[in-house]
Amino acid sequence: MPGLRAALPAALLLLSSFPPAAAERLPWPQVPGVMRPLNPSHREAVWAAWTALHYINSHEASPSRPLALHKVVKAASKMIPRLGWKYYVHCTTEGYIHGENAGSCFATVLYLKKSPPVVHGKCVHAQNKKQIQEEDHRFYEYLQHQKKPITANYIPDSNGNIAHDHLQLWGLAIVGSSYIMWKQSTEHTGYLLAQVSSVKQQIRKDNAVAFKFIVLLHEIPTQQLNVCHMYLVWTLGHPIRVKYSCAPDNHGLEDGSGQDSGSAAGTSHETKGNF
């Protein structure tokens, strides 16, 4: 069956074009506790919206219809004394896989200095939620009944194409990677899923499904690619459970070996997760 071309959401292209944080200056004094409006296209507004969607994707755990940012409609921020910056965003969303209209979300994102961002969000879905749940259920049952582990490499391929049979695996990778990207995001550093280098199912005897992924995450604004080894466990109706370790990829996207090691801001050799 012909593959589908993986088109980056417009908001991803906008995000990757932003200059480093030092190149921008806020046009007002940074007064603690004072709410300040943000230009919806401002880098921090877009990053806060993506941070919220990473959190929502990892907790809703729907590989059939993960969410991507379409655009930020309205945004504001304020400094919370002794904690950090808190962002308030209203954004429209689209399907991460197909780019269809997916609704809108309201969220707050509090960036802490030594902990993952604290996110509270609520989304209004344009799609039929029951249909999404049924698609997830069919995919889940399909995975549960596998006698031979599912394996795949390079999703999307070097031409940006995704085979139809790999679309939901790509969706599952988005959901799992969203957990990592939420945990690693800061006020000035964001992440996007660039490619699944490899994926292999781990056959289990319980009612969960599990996969080992090697994924490439695009770090913004450094443009660095980070290799993450991700062990994902999915139980239908529950948030994804993820263990991961990440390091820079020195060979680039097309190599996809995921075997290099190193260190960088926002990445770690130490295995982390929510098990």
Curated annotation (Swiss-Prot):
Biased segments, Low complexity type: 256-268
Signal sequence coordinates: 1-23
UniProt cross-references to PANTHER family, sorted A to Z: LATEXIN, RETINOIC ACID RECEPTOR RESPONDER PROTEIN 1
Entries under InterPro entries matching the protein: CYSTATIN_LXN, Cystatin_sf, Latexin
Main location: secreted
Family per record: Belongs to the protease inhibitor I47 (latexin) family.
Entry's Gene Ontology molecular function annotations: metalloendopeptidase inhibitor activity
Organism field: Gallus gallus (Chicken)
Keywords: Biomineralization, Protease inhibitor, Repeat, Secreted, Signal
A GO term from the CC aspect: extracellular region
Positions of region (Disordered): 254-275
UniProt GO BP: biomineral tissue development
Tissue/organ expression: Expressed at high levels in the uterine and isthmus regions of the oviduct, and concentrated in the eggshell.
Subcellular location: Secreted
Organism domain of life: Eukaryota
Name of the molecule in the record: Ovocalyxin-32
Pfam families (alphabetical): LXN
Cystatin LXN-type domain span: 32-131, 151-255
Function: Component of the matrix of the eggshell.
